[in-house]
């Protein structure tokens, strides 16, 4: 499947700001399930863009906006060819052994409530893959996916569980936190989801949009497998993987010491009719 | 040097200078308030103290109308109030905070003055002071600024740090002198000349006292106190260290020293020189003819503008 | 508790040779003279503003650390042993950190368990695979040493992040020179005032690029930090700028400071700011103290941060217990300075032992510091022990336990005259790209309360001047 993506971010600054450093994590990498056909980053400000790899092998760019200005706008745009791998990831950039992804973070803290939830989904036999699926099902039944800011500030694992509803990022936090508690390495993924039925796609996912978070978990013998507990399925050719980290903070598409951020994200099947799944979020 | 260091030095000296000025204002107000009304004492001396300190709004919000300002309120507000950001206590607090942030740019002697003053300040009781205690307090404040200036003059390297420190003090000093004139200008105006009685004498003398210039006046003019001479001394006379002209002579020189050390000059040098020229080329008759009040108001606003230019050019 | 070794007086009442002169002098000087000098010392400290803040204490924002006027004496031979052991230890620490962030040989060989690294909050994934200038991580180390008998010095703790206290080491000496010149004329005391020059030389040697004279700055969290005095003190001694995060900015992966003459490039930053606050684009995003983009300059190799980011992975108390093995693994040598035997409560059989012996052990949090959150078994009552037991059982991996060591004592001025008090020692080890530098001595901390083993300044501990005799 060929997916066209456009991701626009507007970062506000205090008027008159100078020398504002910004990091964007907006460049996907190829692996066996996806091939980047073309990708460009466009800024409304003149600056030198040099790609660096972050801790997890994501491509990011840190640059400085000279100013004085009150905003920065970044547009990432490109086209990706994907194929279905039944959720099993091959050829991804790996910088750590899986056991690193047992690490807790503030957003994926195993609070007593999270622990109780994970224990409730624990299987008796030693079957990591079955365990992860059981966890996904339990999560899908416990936390309702909520429309809303997919890329904003997702809830922590604990808060998502408490609320009983969360956006895809909060659900991914709970999935990774619970899997880690059960001794299974898990990590946070950001990316895009193209509509499955080009005709109906827009209506079906109104408000949720093309930006999406999910999780990957590690099962010996299989490797890393993607789990989207909000939709209760493993990754398909409709998913484009952008960044990987321990939690949503680590995959943040833009970080700076600025004020609020606005985003517009669209992904569409570039062979079919031009239907957009479009999201706007603010934080 | 670091912009923040320069900024801290500049404000440190400004706050010490401001504390000194407040102490003089309180001193003079206290003295005038003992003076019988027939000899120039007036009931609203305390109100004009608040006006001169430039914190009228904050004061009124706390204590009610200015006309009814009471001595104890004004003293506690200007000297000690934590709510008044420019009270003497706060000036010393801020000065010490700034000094701590730039300790490496101060000589140990300068730090010692500020730190000791801050420690001593804690020893003054947190209640209304008796008149005796107040006098001792004011003497302590004035002595601190003298010691600080002395330490600065005697121990600091003559480099950009020194020039920024001195610029802050000169700018603040010019502002303070201008404010005293701004509040009291009416007693200097010619219409009052015919009165010429003891009332006016005490008012004029009190202006001179508030800048410690009563003795200097007699040495300079060898004449009895006359309003236009008072104005001349405070505005144009370059011998008088608190006059606007003297302040700007120093200020322009300090800014030029910075510019030549850095090999580059900018808007603050140009503005300082043009203001210095204005003060050198005018006569006091000239100023009275064009309006003393207008002259002073314009000066205060230009002086503020220079502060903003220095900040923009060096301190951010 | 066993009888503590006193560094001045042997159990038979005789005076150990190094202390003979001092002992005679102490006996000859009237008590009121000593009292007077002590007050004088306190006055000087307050006057020059050597203060520190105690966390969680209101109205005590600035407090003095008690200074004890009786010096501690270490012989040349003792120091020789110590300094060799310290150099070995720091070398191993550096090799360990470099390995953990690159090839991970130490994990593959099973010397250190993987989860102790990967699950360690002080491990920084962001440092993985990143070369740091000159491959050195811990440029300024403070290794805490305790002594139990004439021949045994233990390493109690490694401080590989931002060890503090060196300003006290230097100021203590200055004050002693002022107050007791006669004592110095009776002893040959190795000077410490070269520390400033040594530190500057070390920092300069670490600059990422040769060529121009490197611009060094000290980065402080600001005047409200408990160690601010030390930050400004060091900037003064080194003659370098003391900067806050807002004084710096990053452009095209180069760090600049804002000066009155415009931006000026910075090559080496001696940062006294924790990793978490360094760069809001990478670590805590609410940090107002850091420099946005700093890590991008660091990764590009355009600036040296001392100490490096992520050194905490080497200095928590759980890793500590593996240090002897780490030294053997990298250097193929036996550790010259032994570790205090340590039980890791994360291991079930260790935990079992610890729970059975709580009243006689010292139990510490793995990531604790400053003497907070620890249990000193012999000094605690039943209720305190039971309360701690509950904490320990709830989260065993967070604790280690050690036997209660009889820390050596040194003569110390107390209210009733001179009496023995427990001490430790923190020497400072500087690792530059050219060589290792250690100023003889270090900071001696003393528990001012009788019988107390907690020397931390936040718990009322004091300091002493430390003399390494040159002959």
Question: Language-model features: where?
Answer:
Chain A
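Short capping/connector residues at structural and topological boundaries
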Residues: 18, 70, 106-107, 165-166, ...
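Glycine-rich, small/acidic residue-mixed loop/short-helix segments
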Residues: 24-34, 39-41, 231-252, 256-261, ...
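Secondary-structure boundary elements
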Residues: 80-84, 89, 96-166, 174-176, ...
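Conserved structured core elements
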Residues: 3, 168-169
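N-terminal start-of-chain detector that recognizes signal peptides
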Residues: 11-15, 44-51, 158, 185-189, ...
């Amino acid at each position: 499947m060929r997916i066209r993506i456009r991701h626009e971010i507007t970062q506000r600054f205090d008027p008159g700001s100078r020398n504002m450093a910004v990091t964007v994590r907006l460049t996907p990498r190829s692996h066996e399930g996806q091939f980047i056909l073309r990708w460009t980053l466009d800024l409304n400000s003149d600056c030198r863009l040099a790609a660096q790899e972050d801790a997890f092998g994501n491509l990011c760019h840190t640059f400085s906006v000279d100013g004085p200005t009150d905003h920065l706008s970044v547009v990432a745009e490109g086209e990706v060819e994907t194929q279905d791998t039944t959720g099993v990831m091959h050829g991804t950039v790996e910088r750590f052994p899986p056991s690193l992804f047992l690490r807790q973070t503030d957003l994926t803290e195993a609070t007593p409530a999270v622990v109780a939830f994970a224990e409730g989904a624990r299987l008796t036999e030693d079957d990591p893959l079955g365990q992860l699926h059981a966890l996904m099902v339990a999560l899908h039944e416990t936390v309702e996916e909520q429309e809303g800011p997919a890329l904003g500030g997702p809830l922590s694992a604990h808060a998502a569980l408490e609320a009983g509803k969360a956006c895809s990022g909060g659900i991914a936090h709970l999935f990774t936190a619970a899997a880690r508690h059960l001794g299974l390495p898990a990590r946070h993924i950001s990316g895009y989801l193209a509509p499955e039925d080009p005709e109906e796609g827009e209506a079906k996912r109104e408000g949720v949009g093309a930006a999406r978070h999910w999780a990957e978990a590690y099962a010996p013998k299989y490797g890393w497998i993607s789990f989207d507990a909000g939709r209760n399925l493993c990754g398909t050719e409709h998913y484009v993987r952008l960044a990987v980290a321990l939690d949503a903070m680590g995959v943040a598409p833009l970080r700076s010491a600025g004020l609020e951020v606005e985003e517009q994200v669209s992904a569409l099947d570039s062979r079919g009719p031009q239907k957009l799944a479009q999201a706007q979020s603010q934080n | 040097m670091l912009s923040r260091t320069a900024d801290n030095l500049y404000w440190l000296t400004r706050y010490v200078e401001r504390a000194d000025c407040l102490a003089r204002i309180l001193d003079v107000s206290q003295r005038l308030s003992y003076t019988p009304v027939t000899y120039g004492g007036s009931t609203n001396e305390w109100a004009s103290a608040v006006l001169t300190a430039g914190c009228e709004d904050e004061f009124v919000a706390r204590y009610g109308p200015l006309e009814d300002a009471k001595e104890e309120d004004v003293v506690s507000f200007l000297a000690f109030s934590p709510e008044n950001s420019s009270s003497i206590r706060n000036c010393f607090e801020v000065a010490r905070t700034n000094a701590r942030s730039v300790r490496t740019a101060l000589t140990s002697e300068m730090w010692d003055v500020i730190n000791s003053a801050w420690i001593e300040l804690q020893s003054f009781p947190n209640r209304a002071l008796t008149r005796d205690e107040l006098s001792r307090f004011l003497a302590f404040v004035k002595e601190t600024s003298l010691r600080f200036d002395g330490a600065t003059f005697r121990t600091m390297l003559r480099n950009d740090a020194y020039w920024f420190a001195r610029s802050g003090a000169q700018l603040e000093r010019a502002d303070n002198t201008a404010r005293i004139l701004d509040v009291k200008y009416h007693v200097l105006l010619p219409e009052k000349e015919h009165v010429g009685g003891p009332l006016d004498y005490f008012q004029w003398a009190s202006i001179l006292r508030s800048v410690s210039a009563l003795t200097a006046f007699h040495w300079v003019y060898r004449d009895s106190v006359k309003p236009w001479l008072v104005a001349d001394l405070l505005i144009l006379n370059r011998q008088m260290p608190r006059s606007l002209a003297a302040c700007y002579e120093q200020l322009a020189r300090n800014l030029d020293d910075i510019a030549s050390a850095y090999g580059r000059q900018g808007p603050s040098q140009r503005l300082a020189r043009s203001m210095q020229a204005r003060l050198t080329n005018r006569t006091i008759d000239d100023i009275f003819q064009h309006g003393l009040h207008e002259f002073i108001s314009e000066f205060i606003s230009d002086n503020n503008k220079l502060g903003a230019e220095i900040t923009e050019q060096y301190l951010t | 508790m066993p009888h503590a070794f006193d560094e001045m007086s042997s159990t038979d009442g005789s005076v150990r040779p190094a202390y003979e002169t001092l002992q005679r002098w102490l006996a000859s000087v009237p008590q009121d003279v000593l009292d007077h000098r002590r007050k004088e010392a306190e006055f000087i400290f307050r006057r020059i503003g050597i203060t520190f803040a105690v966390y969680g204490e209101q109205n005590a924002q600035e407090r003095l650390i008690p200074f004890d006027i009786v010096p501690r004496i270490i012989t040349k031979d003792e120091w020789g042993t110590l300094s060799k052991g310290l150099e070995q230890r720091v070398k191993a620490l550096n090799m360990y950190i470099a390995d953990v962030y690159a090839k991970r040989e130490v994990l593959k060989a099973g010397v250190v368990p993987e989860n102790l690294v990967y699950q360690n909050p002080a491990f920084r994934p962001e440092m993985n695979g990143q070369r740091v200038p000159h491959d050195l991580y811990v440029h300024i180390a403070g290794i805490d040493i305790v002594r139990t008998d004439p021949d045994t010095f233990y390493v109690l703790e490694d401080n590989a992040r931002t060890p503090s206290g060196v300003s006290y080491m230097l100021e203590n000496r200055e004050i002693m020179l002022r107050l007791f010149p006669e004592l110095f004329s009776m002893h040959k005391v190795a000077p410490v005032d070269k520390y400033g020059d040594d530190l500057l030389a070390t920092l300069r040697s670490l600059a990422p690029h040769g060529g121009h004279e490197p611009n060094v700055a000290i980065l402080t969290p600001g005047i409200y930090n408990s160690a601010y005095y030390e930050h400004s003190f060091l900037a003064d001694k080194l003659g370098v700028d003391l900067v806050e995060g807002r004084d710096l900015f990053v452009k095209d992966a180069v760090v600049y400071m804002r000066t009155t003459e415009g931006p000026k490039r910075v090559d080496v930053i001696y940062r006294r700011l924790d990793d978490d606050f360094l760069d809001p684009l990478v670590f805590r995003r609410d940090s107002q103290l850091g420099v946005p983009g700093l890590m991008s300059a660091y990764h590009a190799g355009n600036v040296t941060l001392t100490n490096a980011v992520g050194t905490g992975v080497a200095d928590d108390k759980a890793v500590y217990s593996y240090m002897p093995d780490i030294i053997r693994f990298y250097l193929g040598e036996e550790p010259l300075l032994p570790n205090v035997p340590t039980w890791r409560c994360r291991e079930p059989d260790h935990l079992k032992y610890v729970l059975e012996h709580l009243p006689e052990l010292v139990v510490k949090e793995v990531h604790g510091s400053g003497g907070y959150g620890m249990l000193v078994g012999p000094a605690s009552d039943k209720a305190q022990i039971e309360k701690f037991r509950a904490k320990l059982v709830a989260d065993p991996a967070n604790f280690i336990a050690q036997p209660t060591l009889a820390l050596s004592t040194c003569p110390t001025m107390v209210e009733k005259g001179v009496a023995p008090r427990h001490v430790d020692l923190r020497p400072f080890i500087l690792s530059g790209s050219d060589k290792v530098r250690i100023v003889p001595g270090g900071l001696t901390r003393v528990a001012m309360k009788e019988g107390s083993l907690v020397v931390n300044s936040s718990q009322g501990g004091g300091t002493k001047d430390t003399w390494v005799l040159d002959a």
